[in-house]
């Protein structure tokens, strides 16, 4: 296909138009007074959501250069979501603000490389400052506050806090569709391990890039599966049995993955190969625990011998398996309870004998999974639309809460970023660069610092604006307040944010800033946009 090229200011202007279109759609959702976006979907019902990454993924612009800009800024949202599980709207707002300010300066003749360096260095300083402000959370009340803020619901906050109390702060909590309008919490047997599908062609949910298997049979292999011949009898048996088949192994030969993927796409068999991405003792432990919890063995298949004595009846069972990009969760494993109990007793015995911290932590983790199980939040709703919207909010809140437990919290409502921005006004900043570059370069690097400093106001400004209040006056007043004081969008008053339960997970805010700065830095150093030229159809009549 032919390509078209567009250069310099023209390229940046059109990229920026796409960036602003997607960011303006996303940022109306931020804060407790944020609004929803309704998305048309080609092969599904419309979706009402306030989830930034979901909105960003769905938008496709008609102008090819604008669409490139839209897709690039959505990277900030997607990568933030992949790491922190939330903060996608904050990342989008920051990326938009930095990119607009950066391109404005570049178009006036500044050196993009110096501006980029300033943005990157300033962002690192802010991240360190956020870590200083961070406060660890320990109590159920604090966990409930984080979940309630993220989801916009005190009821959801309570539910997530209860779930963490049941399975532990590092336990497995997942969501599922309820068959009623009520949202409830239950615990069941289950484990989670690092492992994902061996081929993207095995994915059943393209939107989330995950696979869900209901009532699957489970084959666990302790060695790499090298040929399809090894597992052919089991594949044939599974077709007759009618249940989906989950195959978990340390690795698979390319031939095996291709054959399984092709047969899944053809509808011959519902099979998913999962590569266990744990290593060493952790891999051995994950496979052993999976086998015991699902009622099977971790088979040691020697090359060319296959699984001669293994039939479908020897395989494990579970109520449900969720396979995501980085982890696999097995829910409702149907292993023998007495065997699981003996296995836990054996692990407790090992725990008493070990003096190595790594081994001790691993054994504790295994015991927790096998004895505490998995918490399942069953999401209800009056309609399918309402159920999906609520499920997205709960999943975001779960991710936020886990991030808060991991790295602590800062003042919410964009106040943490506002407070941290003070570090960029330090008069000694110039000294960082005096021995390595010219005065002109230093000026431009500090312009990058200024871009970041001004951009850090954007999340708070948008939250205030979404609440129906003029943000200019409020932001001016907040700059003169003590650290941690911000604007409560619910009461429209200035309050101590953390004391009033208005918080953000430190990890989420740090990740949003890091990814936004990365995207903005890449965009402001872009000078050429290349896109496909659509071929025109010749509709003229020929004799």
Curated annotation (Swiss-Prot):
It holds the Pfam family Cpn60_TCP1. PROSITE patterns: CHAPERONINS_CPN60. Its EC number is 5.6.1.7. It is found in: Cytoplasm. Disruption phenotype: Probably essential, it was not disrupted in a global transposon mutagenesis study. It comes from the Bacteria. GO terms for biological process: chaperone cofactor-dependent protein refolding; protein refolding; response to heat. GO terms for molecular function: ATP binding; ATP-dependent protein folding chaperone; isomerase activity; unfolded protein binding. ATP binds at residues 29-32, 86-90, 413, 504. Keywords: ATP-binding, Chaperone, Cytoplasm, Isomerase, Nucleotide-binding. NCBIfam families: GroEL, PRK00013.1, PRK12849.1, PRK12850.1, PRK12851.1. Together with its co-chaperonin GroES, plays an essential role in assisting protein folding. The GroEL-GroES system forms a nano-cage that allows encapsulation of the non-native substrate proteins and provides a physical environment optimized to promote and accelerate protein folding. This is Chaperonin GroEL. It comes from Mycoplasma genitalium (strain ATCC 33530 / DSM 19775 / NCTC 10195 / G37).
């Amino acid at each position: 296909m032919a390509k078209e090229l567009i250069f310099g200011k023209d390229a940046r202007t059109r990229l920026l138009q796409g960036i602003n279109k997607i960011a303006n759609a996303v940022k109306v959702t931020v804060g407790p007074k944020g609004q929803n976006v309704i998305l048309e979907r080609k092969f599904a019902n419309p979706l009402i959501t306030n989830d930034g990454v979901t909105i960003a993924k769905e938008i496709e612009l008609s102008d090819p250069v604008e669409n490139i800009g839209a897709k690039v800024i959505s990277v900030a949202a997607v990568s933030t979501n992949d790491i922190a599980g939330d903060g996608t709207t904050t990342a989008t707002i920051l990326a938009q603000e930095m990119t607009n300010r950066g391109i404005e300066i570049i178009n006036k003749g500044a050196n993009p490389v110096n501006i980029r360096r300033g943005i990157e260095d300033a962002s690192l300083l802010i991240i360190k400052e956020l870590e200083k402000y961070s406060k660890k959370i320990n109590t159920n009340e604090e966990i409930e506050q984080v979940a309630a803020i993220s989801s916009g619901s005190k009821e959801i906050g309570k539910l997530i806090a209860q779930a963490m109390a049941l399975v532990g702060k590092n336990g497995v909590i997942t969501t599922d569709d309820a068959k009623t309008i009520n949202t409830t919490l239950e615990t069941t047997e289950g484990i989670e391990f690092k492992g994902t599908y061996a081929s993207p062609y095995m994915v059943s949910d393209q939107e989330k890039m995950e696979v869900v298997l209901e009532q699957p049979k489970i084959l666990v292999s302790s060695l790499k599966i090298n040929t399809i011949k090894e597992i052919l009898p089991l594949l044939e048996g599974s077709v007759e049995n009618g249940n989906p088949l989950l195959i978990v192994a340390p690795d698979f030969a390319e031939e095996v993955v291709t054959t399984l993927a092709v047969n899944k796409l053809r509808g011959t068999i519902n099979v998913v190969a999962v590569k266990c991405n744990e290593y060493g003792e952790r891999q051995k432990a994950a496979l052993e625990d999976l086998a015991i919890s699902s009622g099977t063995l971790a088979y040691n298949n020697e090359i060319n011998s296959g699984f001669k004595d293994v039939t479908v009846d020897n395989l494990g069972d579970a109520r449900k398996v969720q396979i995501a990009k980085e982890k696999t969760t097995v829910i409702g494993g149907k292993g023998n309870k007495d065997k699981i109990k003996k296995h836990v007793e054996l692990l407790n015995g090992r725990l008493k004998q070990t003096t190595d911290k790594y081994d001790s932590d691993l054994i504790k983790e295994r015991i927790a999974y096998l004895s505490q199980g998995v918490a399942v939040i069953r999401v209800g709703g009056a309609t399918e639309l309402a159920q999906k919207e609520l499920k997205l909010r709960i999943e975001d809140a779960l991710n936020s809460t886990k991030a808060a437990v991991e790295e602590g919290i800062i003042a919410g409502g964009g106040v943490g970023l506002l407070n941290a921005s003070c570090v960029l006004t330090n008069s000694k900043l110039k000294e960082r660069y005096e021995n390595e570059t010219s005065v002109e370069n230093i000026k431009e690097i500090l312009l990058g610092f200024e871009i970041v400093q001004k951009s850090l106001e954007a999340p708070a400004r948008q939250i205030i604006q979404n609440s129906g209040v003029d943000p200019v006056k409020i932001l001016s007043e907040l700059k003169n307040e003590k650290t941690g004081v911000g604007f409560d969008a619910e009461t429209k008053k200035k309050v101590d944010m953390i004391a009033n339960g208005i918080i953000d997970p430190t990890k989420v805010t740090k990740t949003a800033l890091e990814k936004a700065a990365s995207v903005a830095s890449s965009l402001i150093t872009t000078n050429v946009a290349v896109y496909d030229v659509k071929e025109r159809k010749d509709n003229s009549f020929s004799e």
